[in-house]
Structures are given as C-alpha cells and as structure tokens.
C-alpha cells in the first residue's frame, strides 16, 4: 500500500509503527456552526480511509477532536448571548446528527480541547522549560527560530515567511513568525488558571496536546483539510517535536477543497451550503459517492447538476442490486453449478482491481469505476437461470466493495418501490391537470434510471430494464 505524504511530497510505502495497527489523528470541526460541504468532504474522505484500513485488516485508533474554545466561538457566543460551553455543547450534538446522517463512523474518541486544560498547561510549561517558548504579559509564544526545521511540512522558508509577516505584527514578540500557545484573558472571555495568569490555549497547541495524550509521542497518520497544512499543522509539528525530540507524525494526509459552481465557496458569493441542507434533498450515499468521485488530493466542483448526475449513476447501481435481490427470490437452483464456478472465480478480478486502486493512495474514483465494471458484468451474466449461491455471492461482493466507501449497503426493494410509486402518483396528478410537460418529464427521468412505465386499463405498471 502506498500513500502520498505531504511531508515528503511523494508516495511512500505505508509501514506503520506497530505492524497491524494505525494511530490516526484528524483535525475536527470548530463547533460554532453546522459543518459545510467542504468540511463534509474532509470528514467523508478520512472516514473512508479509516474504513479501508480496517477492511485491509488494520486495527485503527481514530481520534478526531472538537475545537470548543477559540476566537470564532467566543464571538458567536457573545453575539447570541450564550456561553462558549453552551455553544459547544449544542454544535457537538448537531455535528453528531449530521455525521451520523452522512454515514460517518464514530471515532474511537472525539476529545474536546477544554477537557485537556491541565495537559495543555503542562505542554506549554515544558516548552518554556526547554527554551522553545517565552512569556510576555501573560501571553506565551513559541519561538519559531529555535525550531530549526520550521516550514518542512509546507515547504516554506522561514526568512521569506518573516518578511511576509511584518504587517500588523505584535511588537512584543521576539520574531514576527512566533505564534501564541497561551493567550491571556481578555474581558468577557472564558479563562483557566495557569502559571502565567488567567488565560486560554492557542488553537495549535490544543491538537498537539490531544494527539500526544491519546496516541503518544509519534503517530502514524495526521490528517486534515489542505487549508490546515500551514500554519496549523506546521505549528503542531514544531511544538510537538520541540517537546519530545521525536517525529510527531510519520504520514501527513491532506484533502483538497470543494469549489461551488467553479468558485471558491463563500457566504458573500451566496454559494455556501451546509451538509444538512444537502442531506435534506439527497441521500447520504449520493453525497458520499459525489465526494469520493474525485481523488481526495484533487479539488472537486460542486453543483446541484453534478449531484443529480451522481444520483442517476447511483440509481443504476441500486437498480442492479434490486434486480439481484429479486432474483434471490425467483431462482430455482440453490447450489452453485460446475459451469458457474469458473465465472465466480473470474469475479475475484474485480476485488483484486479494487484493492489495487485503493492501495494506490486511496484512489476512490478508480475504485468506484471498478464497482461499475463489476455491475455491468453481473447484469449480463447473472440471470434467472443462475443459482441462488451465485446470485448471493455477487450481491455480497458488490456490498463488500461498497462498504469501505460507505455506500451500497441499503436493501433497495422497499425504498425504491416507495419512491417509484410516489413519482407515478405525481405523474398521474400532472396528467389529470393536463400538465403534459411535467408528466413526460417524470416518465423520462424514470426511464433514465432504468424504470419503464406502462399505461394499462388497470392502471400504471412499472418494470426495470
């Protein structure tokens, strides 16, 4: 298995610190709002990578944190007239609802930064003691010049960074690139007692501390969105390695942005969507498959038209699954016949190809293509003449390959029939109202999904083709 390591900018053989075990830390949300589709891609990508590692036999300890104390949270809480804790509690609950709806598996642990104040204060104290940090007026800063390899993750040169950092710099800092690891209390802010007075941690130290306390000095995978590479992950490396003298993370994985209608997502452009808004209109399978239809290191473009295309493609997969489920009830032969054995063995090539694609830096786009190839093969070769054993095997194989992607696990019969009957009712209503355009549109949309309608004297019947 090979993974692309941002630290070295190349694909590397994936070799864990302890054979068969993976320690993985993913930067989670700041819990002051619902998470948007850009966040959703990050969560889906690393949920999929975690699932695939488990599919390949690894025991994964998966930590994803909640940032529940930070400038954005303080601002939002003050605007609402609530406390930061109340805000955090509310949006952690909302995160779980949306993540569950998106079929994201629960982490081994979701630590909250505020649960680790004693450990964070100890971390800051150790950095001061080792000469990597200094205190000024209750604020504590990390000295980037003391950490010789600062910039190694993002590939940035410290001298160039210093030139760019001289605008609006805090004159008290020894160097413009030094960053806060402890902030003194300002009026109206929550604070904790520390050797430097009342204050709160900087954002970067929170993740370093939680990773250290829950996973140890060195971890296998540290991951997050590509926007976190600098300064967040760069600063995490500096703090952690300064404290322990050991490599912080062996592999760094970063997922790319989601653009909306070929533009960067932003509230000012009115192209900002929360995952919840999309999940009200589309099933989780649709959003997951869309997010995984491009390589995780490549930016993807989001639009409702592209989601509709993904839905149509997914419907074709589910139609095939539905046909196989129906065949299970209809086929007469129970046991695998001799002439089917060779075909069953041939189907293994799809599993091998799928693993080959996913082992190559988790290439979900190509893995999904393999599933479509499998479905096309099965549609042609598994029929009413096949044995029940072969039909069941093909169904199980499709679901097995869908499982690491978090798709194709539902039984389709009831939900598909219900949806089609509802659309037929809408079409009948449109026809009564002489809205022929809508009636034809519903019929054509169903036909695209492999559903043909037959108008009979007894009513409308439908069948899959």
Swiss-Prot record:
ATP binds at residue 267. Its main location: cytoplasm. A motif ('KMSKS' region) lies at residues 264-268. It is found in: Cytoplasm. InterPro entries: Cys-tRNA-ligase, Cys-tRNA-synt_Ia_DALR, Cys-tRNA/MSH_ligase, CysS_C, Rossmann-like_a/b/a_fold, tRNA-synt_1_cat_dom, tRNAsynth_Ia_anticodon-bd. Zn(2+) binds at residues 27, 207, 232, 236. One of its GO terms (molecular function) is zinc ion binding. GO terms for biological process: cysteinyl-tRNA aminoacylation. Monomer. This is Cysteine--tRNA ligase. The lineage of its organism: Bacteria, Bacillati, Bacillota, Clostridia, Eubacteriales.
